[in-house]
Design a protein with these regions (language model features):
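Short alpha-helical transmembrane interface motifs in multi-pass membrane proteins
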Residues: 27-31, 70, 105-110, 133-137
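Alpha-helical transmembrane segments and their helix-entry boundary regions
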Residues: 20-21, 126, 134-138, 163-167
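Signature of the first transmembrane helix
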Residues: 1-49, 79, 83, 148-149
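Transmembrane-helix boundary and interhelical linker motifs in polytopic inner-membrane proteins
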Residues: 16-17, 33-71, 90-94, 123-124, ...
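Short membrane-interface helical motifs at transmembrane helix boundaries
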Residues: 79-99
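Residue-level recognition of pore/gate-forming positions within transmembrane alpha-helices
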Residues: 1, 28-31, 66, 75, ...
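Membrane-interface junctions at transmembrane-helix termini in multi-pass inner-membrane proteins
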Residues: 113-143, 153-156
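Hydrophobic alpha-helical transmembrane segments
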Residues: 109, 138-170
Length: 170
């Protein structure tokens, strides 16, 4: 918790209020898809856990393979939809200063790529959850927190556009 608070403080002081707001507006537009990701993860995990309980390796492989294909399809459709919506958002919905439009578009495209990769990653998370390997999740959580702190330090000390650097690295 303390590392997260310190990271937020570093990012806010590095980006400034305007760029931090731009990042949150654009990120918030994409993060609303989190419910879709959570729903898909729960459905996939349910089937994987059931097959794990049966001990049927062939069924687990079939479920995993079908899940991969379905999630790749959903990821492609989501990517297409988000790229279409991008034109609408940047041509009237978002109120972004003209000099920051390029940086905002880079952040949006980075968020779209991150969303696509997160959707494709769902079946792998479901396998880990089905095995109930919580040590793995706790280690990943600690690593993620430290990685966010490292990204904050990179943003503080970079000479490049801090908003683009932060958007691409997150």
């Amino acid at each position: 918790v303390f590392i997260s608070l310190y990271t937020t403080r570093l990012i806010l002081s590095s980006l400034g209020a305007s760029d931090f707001g731009i990042f949150n507006i654009i990120g918030g537009a994409i993060v609303m898809l989190g419910f879709l990701n959570a729903t898909m993860a729960n459905a996939t995990q349910r089937f994987m856990s059931y097959a794990e309980g049966e001990g049927n390796l062939i069924k687990k492989r079939q479920i995993f393979n079908v899940s991969i294909v379905l999630h790749i399809g959903v990821a492609v459709l989501t990517c297409i939809l988000l790229l279409i919506v991008m034109r609408l958002l940047f041509n009237g919905v978002f109120n972004i200063p003209v000099q920051r439009i390029f940086a905002a578009k880079v952040i949006y495209l980075s968020a779209v790529a991150s969303t696509v990769l997160t959707i494709i990653n769902v079946p792998y998370d479901s396998v880990v959850n089905a095995h109930e390997n919580m040590l793995y999740y706790s280690l990943i959580g600690i690593f993620e927190c430290l990685l966010r702190l490292a990204i904050a330090f990179v943003c503080v000390y970079t000479n490049s556009d801090k908003l683009i650097v932060y958007g691409v690295l997150t």
